[in-house]
Amino acid sequence: MPERNGFMANLTYDKKEIESVIDKIVKRTMRMDLTWDWPGGVAYYGVCEAYAATGNKEYIELLKDRIDEYIELGLPSWTVNTCAMGHAMLSLYEYSGDEKYLDIAKSKIDYIENEALRFGDNVLQHTVSVNNDFPEQCWADTLFMAAFFLLRAGVMLKDEALIDDALNQYYWHIKYLQDPATGLFYHGYNNITKDHMSGFFWGRANAWAAYTMSEVGRTLPECYLYPKFLDIVGSLNEQLASIKLLQTEDGLFRTILDDPDSYEEISASCGIAAAMINKGNPLHIKYINKATAGILKNVSEDGRVLNVSGGTAVMKDRDGYRGISRDWIQGWGQGLALAYFSKILNYDKIRSDGAL
């Protein structure tokens, strides 16, 4: 009989290599001319994760200087997408104690709670501008840009109303977007036409869903006392059990997950694999190790995360998704890669049995 020593299989990686790759990605990310919009929000979330994992204050100080420059230049109008930068505001406040960062985070919260367009049971409509671009549509992207941010803020501020709103967003995005037959997430849902529009299982949508769901239990104290958390657990379990089978031989995931002719996409691969680390199920370790090898091959010597698809609306057809360029450096690719590699470094601290 195997010995019960409390030890489970571990990840396979070179710590110095991962730290070096993180350093390269952070430095290259901070050379990008990102702004208050979601590319910066995801990128700088990753920089904050890198600081938390490595303890390298250079990373958070570089970010602090950049954000201070942004603040001096003035604040834009908020949308769901621009609320992604709220993650960095919370992290900078935790680091520095400077109320100006918390004040900006609170202004984003005020927008979400009092101005953002909603439909149905207070479900956030995905917005990318001050215009009503996508009437009564929910997108998986909103889970990262707004719901996860609201959850973090609610926990930090001990505000149960924010926590409840965040969990409500998760609950309804699961109900609207997850396919019960496959466990995979559609990119978007149109509440007016009552359909998923073109109806594809877009890779990055599944990364947004998986990653943010996997963070709930690690963010919310006594999460098991919130009924909607159990829906999140069930949803993530179903999704990861299905999605692991779609991993390619190179350890990656495709831009349309179940389309063998779609290209392998790195931001989706990072978000999905990071969710597996967070989940802690030992059955996923072999998939995580395979992903690490594949993702490392897609980071250039100067810290660019390669083969990341450009900004993607809910496209009209399969070719629309296949045709999105992956030639350029993207903030979300940098940020999700940093989040993934940071999870690897923190694995011994966050490992669990995957139960919740």
Role assignments for model-derived ranges:
Residues 123-189:
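Aromatic- and glycine-enriched pocket-lining scaffold segments that form the walls
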Residues 210-257:
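Oxyanion-binding "anion nests"
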Residues 66-67, 124-132, 188-193, 252-261:
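Short linear capping/connector segments at secondary-structure termini
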Residues 184-204:
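Acidic/Ser/Thr-rich, low-complexity mid-to-C-terminal regulatory regions of eukaryotic proteins
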Residues 96, 153-164, 216-230, 279-283:
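Inter-helical turn/loop segments and adjacent helix faces that build the functional surface
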Residues 35, 138-145, 158, 162-165, ...:
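Short, contiguous, pocket-lining structural segments
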Residues 6-39, 48-58, 69, 76-88, ...:
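CBM-like carbohydrate-recognition segments
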